[in-house]
Design a protein with these regions (language model features):
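Conserved N-terminal beta1-alpha1 strand-loop-helix module at the mouth
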Residues: 1-94, 100-129, 154, 160-163, ...
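A short acidic, helix-capping loop that chelates divalent metal ions and anchors anionic groups
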Residues: 78, 136-142
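A short, polar/charged loop-to-alpha-helix boundary motif
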Residues: 93-95, 138-139
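Short alpha-helical segments enriched in small residues
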Residues: 148-149
Length: 209
């Protein structure tokens, strides 16, 4: 199984709704240049042309700052770039099919919501990381499954690959993970609305040392 040291720290994800292309571009470079290791491109409600343009911008910035880029549920886009990974949700393509298309040298992450069984299956089938959440109520998704911190404590007993948490996480509640210490913490509005993204990265680095 491919291991990558960049599967750690704050894991920003693009919001579904952008105020404007200009504001997205401005905040995007701030975030990618803030010291993160990994970034996810996740845009589901745009034209193909606009999605490709924003992806190209994101890709170039990730190359510039040596940040691992993950594409959410778009294997057609992912297979055209040898150096990007793929994140798979519950109703998306399964990991076996993704591996056949992308090969064994790509990073593939799996959403497990609050299911230890899903995580064990993902690990057994070659996932590089698993994601749990929503950890808190969130406005980023209309429908979500809450995951308790107790589930994470149990997960850490059985899962050897990196663990990510997501959902409603911000600079105020991020410290609730001090004890559990997940490998990655995904943030959407929690970092895209932050004036100084490096502040969030510093908090994560402090308790994950």
């Amino acid at each position: 199984m491919l291991k990558d040291s960049r599967l750690s720290g704050i894991y920003p994800i693009t919001p579904d709704v952008l105020l404007s292309d200009l504001s997205y571009e401005e905040v995007l470079e701030k975030i990618i240049a803030s010291g993160i290791n990994i970034f996810q491109f996740r845009i589901k409600s745009m034209s193909i042309r606009k999605t490709r343009r924003l992806f190209s911008l994101t890709y170039d910035l990730c190359i510039k700052y040596n940040v691992l880029l993950i594409i959410n549920n778009n294997i057609e886009l992912a297979k055209n770039f040898d150096d990007v990974g793929l994140h798979i949700g519950d109703s998306d393509i399964n990991i076996s099919e993704a591996r056949k298309i992308l090969g064994n040298n790509r990073i593939i992450g799996i959403s497990c919501y609050n299911s230890i069984e899903k995580a064990l299956n993902a690990q057994a089938n070659g996932a590089n990381y698993v994601s749990f959440g929503s950890m808190f109520p969130t406005k980023s998704k209309k429908r979500y499954t809450l995951c308790s911190h107790d589930v994470l404590e149990e997960v850490k007993k059985h899962i050897k690959i990196p663990i990510c948490v997501i959902g409603g996480i911000n600079h105020e509640n991020i410290k609730s993970f001090n004890k559990i210490k997940p490998d990655m913490i995904s943030m959407i509005s929690g970092i895209f609305s932050e004036q100084k993204p490096s502040k969030i990265v510093t908090i994560m680095n402090t308790f994950n040392e």
